[in-house]
């Protein structure tokens, strides 16, 4: 029986060396005594959760963060032993499950903590207190709520507060007024807490890269870990070169010559102005290569060539400058020769952010993990295979 990891020549390459380099540089930037929390939610922003987590931990991260309890349990089942914080809301009836898997939750309201205490019948629940300083998503907002939290902890010794944090709404923007307001508000709200015994974190990638101090004792490193800028506004403020880890590739599955006046793809929106070589690429919007990318450049033999016509669910066509043999490599995100298509370029075409592009590339696209140019592992959820070297 074949052990080939995938049977369609479309794949993403994840450079674990790049992730390690970004983590190592960030650790040097924030200082040896500040914890680096590697954010690997949403399958590590589409890069591969367990593989990214292991690389980050090897490079100096001391703990992990995810968005939902399911992600944390998945990491535990894949063998990750490092501390894991769930940043999002977990219904209090599941706190025993979190404790079973040694997962730290976010306590985000007085009511949640009261219910969590009711459901913690044995053992203890570890949590970080979320403080809302202006994001208005999750968290306690007032000094009174903080005092109520402390009272709940006094009455419920099974509840163990291990950290406190907030999240900035505008840390990646040029205008710093709102960001600085949140920073000051955070310091005010946490003042009554026993901070000496807590992990205190407010800086995300944007704030962590921008700030020279004020990290408290932990920084959450998300988008920057993957070598992506938090925003274009920060281009001149990043203290070291971020190295992108994600590239996306396919091949020409079919090449044909169409005559002047013939059309391509649904809606017949593309019509050849002259006899033209057309290549078919087995990538479509079901893979996360969205229809709005019609007319976008891709790379073939180091040249920028444009997608012809509408993108289909599973395939798209490209206008070629000459005949190429089927099997010719195509790069959608990444480098060929002197040409480079960045995640930011694709985000610009989609009028969105690079975070969304990375998360949109679906699990139907196998991830190939490389280190120092060598393939270390290939993960294909469709075939439920992980092949390691």
UniProtKB/Swiss-Prot annotation:
Pathway: Amino-acid biosynthesis; D-alanine biosynthesis; D-alanine from L-alanine: step 1/1. One of its GO terms (cellular component) is cytosol. The active site is at residues 41, 266. Substrate binds at residues 137, 313. It catalyses: L-alanine = D-alanine. GO terms for biological process: D-alanine biosynthetic process; peptidoglycan biosynthetic process. It holds the Pfam family Ala_racemase_N. GO terms for molecular function: alanine racemase activity; pyridoxal phosphate binding. Belongs to the alanine racemase family. This is Alanine racemase 1. It comes from Bacillus subtilis (strain 168).
């Amino acid at each position: 029986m074949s052990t080939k990891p995938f049977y369609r020549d479309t794949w993403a390459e994840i450079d674990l060396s790049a992730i390690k380099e970004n983590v190592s540089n960030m650790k040097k930037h924030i200082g040896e005594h500040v914890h680096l929390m590697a954010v690997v939610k949403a399958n590590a922003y589409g890069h591969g959760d367990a593989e990214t987590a292991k690389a980050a931990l090897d490079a100096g991260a001391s703990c992990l963060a995810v968005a939902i309890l399911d992600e944390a349990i998945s990491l535990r089942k894949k063998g990750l032993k490092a501390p894991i914080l769930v940043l999002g809301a977990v219904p209090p009836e599941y706190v025993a499950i979190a404790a079973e898997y040694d997962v730290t939750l976010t306590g985000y309201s007085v009511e949640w903590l009261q219910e969590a205490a009711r459901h913690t019948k044995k053992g203890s629940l570890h949590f970080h207190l979320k403080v809302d300083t202006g994001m208005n998503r999750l968290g306690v907002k007032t000094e009174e709520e903080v005092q109520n939290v402390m009272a709940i902890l006094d009455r419920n010794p099974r509840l163990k507060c291990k950290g406190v944090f907030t999240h900035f709404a505008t840390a990646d923007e040029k205008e710093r007024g709102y960001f600085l307001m949140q920073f000051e508000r955070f310091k005010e709200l946490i003042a009554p807490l026993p901070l000496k015994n807590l992990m205190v974190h407010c800086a995300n990638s944007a704030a962590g890269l921008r700030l020279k101090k004020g990290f408290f004792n932990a920084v959450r490193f998300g988008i920057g870990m993957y070598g992506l800028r938090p925003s274009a506004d920060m281009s001149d403020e990043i203290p070291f070169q971020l190295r992108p880890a994600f590239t996306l590739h396919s091949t020409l599955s079919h090449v044909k010559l169409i005559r002047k006046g013939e059309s391509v793809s649904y809606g017949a929106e593309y019509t050849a102005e002259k006899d033209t070589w057309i290549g078919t690429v087995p990538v479509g919007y079901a893979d996360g290569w969205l229809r709005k990318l019609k007319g976008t450049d891709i790379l073939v033999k180091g040249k920028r060539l444009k997608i012809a016509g509408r993108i289909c669910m599973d395939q798209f066509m490209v206008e070629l400058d000459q005949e190429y043999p089927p099997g010719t490599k195509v790069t959608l995100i990444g480098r060929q020769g002197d040409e480079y298509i960045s995640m930011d370029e694709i985000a610009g075409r989609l009028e969105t952010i690079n975070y969304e592009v990375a998360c949109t590339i679906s699990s139907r696209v196998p991830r190939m993990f490389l280190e120092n140019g060598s393939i270390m592992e290939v993960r294909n959820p469709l075939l439920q295979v992980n092949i390691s070297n």
